[in-house]
Amino acid sequence: MAQAPKKATAKKTAAKTLNFHQQLVTNQWLLNFFNPNTLTGLKERLEHAKFEGIDEDGQTKFFHELCNSLFNKHLVDENTLRRYDLNIVKHWQQITERRNYHEGITLHLKYFQYLSLLVAEIYLDWYFAKTEDMLLGLNQQLALFNQEQSLDQQFELYSQDDLNKVAYWSATGRGK
């Protein structure tokens, strides 16, 4: 990950207070894969129950909605997104198979569960298959972040060794 903030050589300036989400450079980089590139915007588009479930073609309904302009096709093409989605479906079905059978229901992914799994797919794919592109993208995002910071709040660029360290946090917002 980005290294500790650099020491300021000049007199400290009043640092602008950032909220937790503004400081998550990796999160900001991953949000660039989506249109809109905010969690609030994605929630507004995907939270509806009509997008839950799997279509006849084996893809999630979220996948079809993402293909309708919610995904940045300059970063990931539709076939790659399709592969991510099919992997999510495969794992979700394995995870829920016994519970679905015993309870006589079919559990469907909620939008926040789906997005969590999708960003994990993206991160892992880029980490293993597109390492240099990932490093470049993260450092571009970090440069944008650093432009808004005082010198003592800036972070050093990522190195390839930093990419295998990632914190994963997912919350439903329901206080559980």
Where are the regions that the model predicts?
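Conserved pre-motif I regulatory segment
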Residues: 67-170
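Conserved glycine(s) of the Walker
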Residues: 175-176
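Charged, amphipathic alpha-helical stretches
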Residues: 2-78
